[in-house]
Amino acid sequence: MLGDGVLWPRFLVFPTIAIVGYVGFVTGVGGDSLLVRLIWSVFLGYCWFCVAGSFHEAVHQTMGTSRNANVWFGRVVGTFLGIPYTVYRESHIRHHAYMNTSDDFELWPYCKPGASLAFRRAFVLFDIFGAILANPIVYGRIYFVRNSPLSQQARTAVQREYMAIAVFWGSIIAGMTILSLNGIVDLQRFDLMWLLPMPIAAAFNGFRKFTEHLGMASTDPILGTRTVLGKNWVTRVCSYFNFNLDIHGPHHRFPRAPHFELESKLAEYQLKHPGIVIPVFPTYLAAVMDTIPCLWQNPGVGVNAGGTNQTFVKAGVENFTSEVGREASSEADGIANRRVA
């Protein structure tokens, strides 16, 4: 991969492009036609989507060696996104431990055995077109749900982070209102389309989740995910700036592995298990094309995709494990890509 463990380009390139690009977007560079503005919105949405990828790395605490730096960086990003760092981390820990099962908070409702096909189809639309609201709801469930698995310490941290989000956004709204009332800022000149890149970035994140998991029946971390590993430069550059998250099977099996080790982890697994067909795709487009039928035919994972509810991690997990899973059996191999229409 580009630079392996070198992090700084990820934190410099897309934030810089996004900030400079926003200036161009707001000032009308390229014209003010609807098509030009939509192109700007999609481009900037992708930039912010890449920037938000660092939130995922902070949750895993794999950006450098400082735990505190990861935590506070994650809290800053989470405050901006409206998703408390601790909510995301606790939900994501269980996503790795209980992937594609009923205990997987991140893949609700697609993993819930009792969720109707109609509800899951409707939620797909919400996950894409209302992603800016869907993401905080899905991640926040672990805090608000009855019989929440969160410890009291985690609940206290979540409460404080929700308060910080409310204060941050409340201050911005109040400040803009005061500036407007005093004639310093004319909100009538504000174009709501300038906000469009944000929900588009959230939609990119929702579709990324689908590409990684939707339609996958197996609960084995390697076989129950789609992995993208290509040789063309477009795929590899996109992978680099998304912290190699598309090498998703190894990421799920080795949650504590730094992103730049995932390709070698996959090669090691393939060498040990030459007879197992792993869902590896050469391009993002190939993975997306495999996902698209699942969006409507049967948007589900695990039981809802024809698999089982079997887990490979003990109950009550409270942190990422070093390695999740087992030696893939012929049964798991057989259901890895099976879907139910």
Which residues fall in each region the model found?
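Transmembrane alpha-helical segments that form the membrane-embedded catalytic/substrate-channel core
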Residues: 45-58, 84, 88, 133-139, ...
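Membrane-cytosol interface motif
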Residues: 71-80, 219-232
